[in-house]
Structures are given as structure tokens and as C-alpha cells.
């Protein structure tokens, strides 16, 4: 039996994909057997890693787990491939539509699947703290302010929506503010405001590697699980 997990990285040309490739190459528990990019002219090998264009997805070699940080338009094909090959999928692709989220739930009946808007340990802890604050602060206002780099397209961010769900389930309706500026990796502020007082809970990511390390940790732990839709915090904390 191999001592490493065979890894497919989907969205390998993006910021997260590049971090994943670098960190996985430094981790002996992983071997990247395929990297999929949307704009590759044809399959090729770079630094020992086979690269495939998105159109060649069906031709990728066997893998034990896939990590996906791509765009919504490429997500459905990867999900179908993982289901067809009965392989776990870890995805951080945001901006999915309602039909794609429904497909995620259906796929969870057949494979172990993790979808998350944020794979850092700190964000997982923040979601837990926000849930606890929501229990204690009924009737308070809640505002969620997220800041990201100018190239991020979706707003509010997936992480902000996850935080909003954590308070909404406590009966508090959150309000969102999105900022796009410079090269901000990711800042999230959750503010609870009452009469004469307020509480602020903040998470700031200063390096994209925190998300890549978290995704690799989750990928390692989801292999061998029974089919189901798992939360990041189920596996990372």
C-alpha cells in the first residue's frame, strides 16, 4: 500500500492552486498525480506534475482525493468525475448557484464531500464563536464586514455568508458590507451591537498558505470516510 495520497488539484493556475502545488510538493504524505488548469493548451509535465486542460479532465490518472479551488463554470464537471470514480472531493470554490449546491448534496450520498468557503483553523474557530455569541446576544444587531483583494469577484464572500448563516440560525438577521482593495488576502469582522455596547470578532488572513494547509489537512482526513457532506470544522479542529 502506498504511503502517500494521490492528489488531484483542480484550479491549479490560481492563487490557491499555486499554494497547494507548492505545499503538497513539500509534504511526503501527498503525491500530485494531476493538476487541472482552465487555459492549458494541452497536457504537459512541469516539475514532475502532469498538467491537464479543463477539457481533458476525463483523462486524468487515478487519484485518491481531489482538491478544488476553481471557478463555478468548471466545478460541475469535477463533481461528476469524483462521483463516477467514487473519490472524495474537497472544494473551496465559491459563487456556486443553487443548482450546483443541490448537486453537492446529492453527491454527498455517494462520496465523502467537503465544501467550505474558508479552510483556515482560525475561521473555523470564529464560526464557533459567532454561534455562541448569537446564542447570548438575542435582539442585538449584527453586521459582517469582509475585505478582499480587488480581483475577488463574488460578494459577499463565501466566508461572510458562512458567518451569516451561523447567526441567522440563532434568529439574528445579519447585514453585509463588502470591500475590495489592494491585495488583501481576507479580513472578516463580525460586529454585534446592543444599546451602549458592542462586540467585535475579527479574523485576518495575512497569507494564503493558511487556506492551502487547511485544505490539505481536510483532504487527508476525509479519505476513508463514509459518504456524506462534511463541514470544514468537522475535520480541521
From Swiss-Prot:
Pathway: Amino-acid biosynthesis; L-lysine biosynthesis via DAP pathway; (S)-tetrahydrodipicolinate from L-aspartate: step 4/4. It is found in: Cytoplasm. It catalyses: (S)-2,3,4,5-tetrahydrodipicolinate + NAD(+) + H2O = (2S,4S)-4-hydroxy-2,3,4,5-tetrahydrodipicolinate + NADH + H(+); (S)-2,3,4,5-tetrahydrodipicolinate + NADP(+) + H2O = (2S,4S)-4-hydroxy-2,3,4,5-tetrahydrodipicolinate + NADPH + H(+). The keyword Heme does not apply. One of its GO terms (cellular component) is cytosol. CDD domains: DHDPR_N. NAD(+) binds at residues 11-16, 92-94, 116-119. Its EC number is 1.17.1.8. (S)-2,3,4,5-tetrahydrodipicolinate binds at residues 149, 158-159. GO terms for biological process: diaminopimelate biosynthetic process; lysine biosynthetic process via diaminopimelate. Keywords: Amino-acid biosynthesis, Cytoplasm, Diaminopimelate biosynthesis, Lysine biosynthesis, NAD, NADP, Oxidoreductase. Its main location: cytoplasm. Belongs to the DapB family. This is 4-hydroxy-tetrahydrodipicolinate reductase. It comes from Xylella fastidiosa (strain M12).
Amino acid at each position: 500500500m502506498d504511503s502517500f495520497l494521490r492528489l488531484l488539484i483542480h484550479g491549479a493556475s490560481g492563487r490557491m492552486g499555486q499554494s497547494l502545488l507548492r505545499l503538497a510538493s513539500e509534504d511526503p504524505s501527498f503525491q500530485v498525480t494531476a493538476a487541472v488548469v482552465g487555459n492549458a493548451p494541452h497536457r504537459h509535465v512541469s516539475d514532475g506534475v502532469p498538467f491537464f486542460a479543463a477539457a481533458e479532465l476525463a483523462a486524468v490518472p487515478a487519484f485518491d482525493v481531489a482538491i478544488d479551488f476553481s471557478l463555478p463554470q468548471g466545478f460541475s464537471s469535477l463533481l461528476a468525475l469524483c462521483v463516477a470514480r467514487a473519490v472524495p472531493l474537497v472544494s473551496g470554490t465559491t459563487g456556486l448557484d443553487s443548482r450546483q449546491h443541490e448537486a453537492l448534496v446529492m453527491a454527498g450520498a455517494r462520496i465523502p464531500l467537503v465544501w467550505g468557503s474558508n479552510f483556515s483553523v482560525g475561521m473555523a474557530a470564529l464560526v464557533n464563536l459567532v454561534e455562541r455569541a448569537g446564542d447570548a446576544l438575542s435582539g442585538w444587531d449584527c453586521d459582517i464586514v469582509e475585505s478582499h483583494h480587488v480581483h475577488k469577484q463574488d460578494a459577499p464572500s463565501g466566508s461572510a455568508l458562512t458567518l451569516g448563516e451561523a447567526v441567522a440560525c440563532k434568529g439574528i438577521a445579519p447585514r453585509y458590507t463588502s470591500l475590495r482593495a489592494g491585495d488583501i488576502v481576507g479580513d472578516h469582522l463580525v460586529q454585534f451591537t446592543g444599546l451602549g455596547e458592542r462586540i467585535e470578532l475579527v479574523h485576518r488572513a495575512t497569507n494564503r498558505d493558511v487556506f492551502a494547509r487547511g485544505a490539505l489537512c481536510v483532504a487527508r482526513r476525509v479519505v476513508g470516510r463514509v459518504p456524506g457532506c462534511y463541514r470544514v470544522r468537522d475535520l480541521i479542529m
